[in-house]
Amino acid sequence: MRFALLPAALCVLVVLLVAGCGGGSDEPDRDGATEQAPVLGSQCDDEEAAPGELGFPAFATRNTTRVGGADAIADAAGVAQAVFPSRDRDTRPRTVALVDTADWRVAVSAAQLMAPPLRAPLLFSDGGELPAATEQALGRLIPTGAKEAGGAQVIRVGEAAAAEGYKTTAVEGADHAALAQAIDRLQTAAAGKPSGAVVVASSEQPGFAMPAAGWAAKSGNPVLWVTRDAIPAATRAAISAHKRPRIYVLGPESAVSKKVLDQLSKLGEARRVSGADPVANAIAFARFSDGSFGWNVVDPGHGVVFANTQRPLDAAAAAPLSATGTYGPLLLLTAANALPAPVQDYLLDIQPGYDKDPVRGVYNHGWMIGDESAVAVDVQARIDALLEIQPVESGDAA
């Protein structure tokens, strides 16, 4: 395309927000991050219109988009505004879930509130305060109020800071297990009936639990908690409220023992979905299907979300992306600068292909969650190539 064909004031990039805002979360330092915020509104002859200044390739490639927060607070704010652009009443959320960064388990459980009918994206408080990114996001989102939550604009979960000036309802519980039960109780009341399935995950090993957040956001199934060898009373009570549901235990025996699985079987039909490590576990969950439960992503034409196991709060922050748009499961990296071989193999398995015309094919898309300390641009570029549609006579990635 020739520049002469473009209006003189254009060459604009739309981008998702992102600076670090956390003070007391479990996220590692971000000193190694190198990406810059893109410049909006640059003219084509400006020096600022260079690809790096416009944000390419870090913020977007042909098949990937990055929410480049230095922490989960910024990522959640960016995701919420990507899912709800809030330019008019129809593009605003009705309510928002506000969770503190102090407990990743509560955040993962709160992802359930993104499911219908509440459709509440998640924002974070930090140490009893609202970070600037959260305040700004709330001010832009301006939730309209959810009648299923008593007209609340904000659902304050646990010890989250108060959002002054917004009609708020509180979800309370003594600990993460009790809060998960209370979150599920609110979702059940809003939906009018309990879901037929629940997810049970390890409260001790976040890498195995992270993929549950996106599924909860899509399905409305609760994420309930156990230790390796025990089931909290609140979890038992929450499962019982679903009247012998299908119980899907996410993670291997090293995370949730057979003894616990056997005990869960007394409360409903219990089944394990697992991989030997967090990377393999996430892939197993992405592939899994049992009736109406499970992603069943075993062929091309899907969205996928990528996050780093070192940032468990990002799973909750990103959950709305699994419940809107291209939908899709969470896959995991264990290091920013390396794409695990099992993830590469899985992406090759679901890579789109075409016979004669790529326009007649289906397409994959990937969301990168976090800055370059979470997902390096080199890894993003490799993922982009693995997502690209290919001629069927060539099995090679672009």
Model-derived regions, located:
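C-terminal motif of bacterial Sec signal peptides marking the signal peptidase cleavage site
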Residues: 17-20
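Extracellular glycan-binding segments that recognize GlcNAc-based cell-wall polysaccharides
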Residues: 23-398
